Amino acid sequence: AIVAKVDVKEVAERAGIPDIVRESTGELAGSAVDVLRRQIVAIDAIASGTAYRLTGRDPATRPTSPSGLEEETGAGRKGRGQVTGHYAGPLSRLSAFLIDTAIVWFSFLLTIAGIAFIVDVFSRGETPPATDLGPIGLAVLAVWAFLYMWASLTIAGRTLGMGIVGIRVVDRQGEPLSARQSLIRTVVFPFSFLIFGLGFLGIFISPERRTMHDAAAGSVVVYDWGDRTAEMPAPLTRWVSRRAEELATIDSE
C-alpha cells in the first residue's frame, strides 16, 4: 500500500535520474563520434605529412595553426595529442564535403518532390517526375548548393558536414569569416575542381593546408570539436613527440 502511494516519477526527477540519463546518452554518442574523428585526424596527419615530406620539407617544421587562434598542444586525456585550432587535413575536409553533398542532394530532392506532389494534385498528373531535373533543375540545384554553403559559412563558420566531422573555416588570423569572404570562398570553390582538382593540391603541400578557394578568400580550415577537445590517437601523439625531440637534438648540435 505504501509503495502504491509513492510517486515514482517525482522521486526520479528529484534524484536527477532523467538528467543523468540524458547526459550519459549524450556523452556516449559524443564519444562514438570522437573515436571516428580521431582516426580521421590520424589519417590527415599521415597523408599530409607524407606529401609535405615529398616536397623536401620536414612536417615537424610546418605551422600548426593561425597566429591569432588559441591552439591546444601537448598530450591530453590518455596521452592523446590535442589538436584544437590546428590546420585540418585532407580526409577531414573530404569527409565533410561528401556529407554536405548528400545533405544538399537529399534536401533538394525532397523539396522538389514536395512541390511536384502539390503541383501534380492540381494539374491532374501532367507534371514530369521530380527526379527529371533538366537544365533548369540543375541550375536551381546549383543555386541551392551555393546558398547552403554561403549561408552556413557566414552564420556558423561551417556547414553541417563540417560540424559533424569537427572542422571550422576561419580567416588566416583565426577570426570568423566575413560575409564577403564566405561569398568569395563559395564562388571560387567549384573552380578548385578544374584540371583534375589541382585547386586542392594545397591541402597537401601548402604550409597552412590552403586550397585555391582558401587562398582567394583568405581563409583556412581548422579542427574544432565544439565544447570537446580535438585529439589525435595516443600512438601517433607519441611518434610526433619523439620526432620533435629528435629535431630539437639536431638543432642543438
Model segments located where?
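Amphipathic, rod-like alpha-helical scaffolds used for oligomerization/assembly
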Residues: 1-79
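Voltage-sensor-like transmembrane helices and their cytoplasmic interface
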Residues: 7-10, 16, 162-168, 217
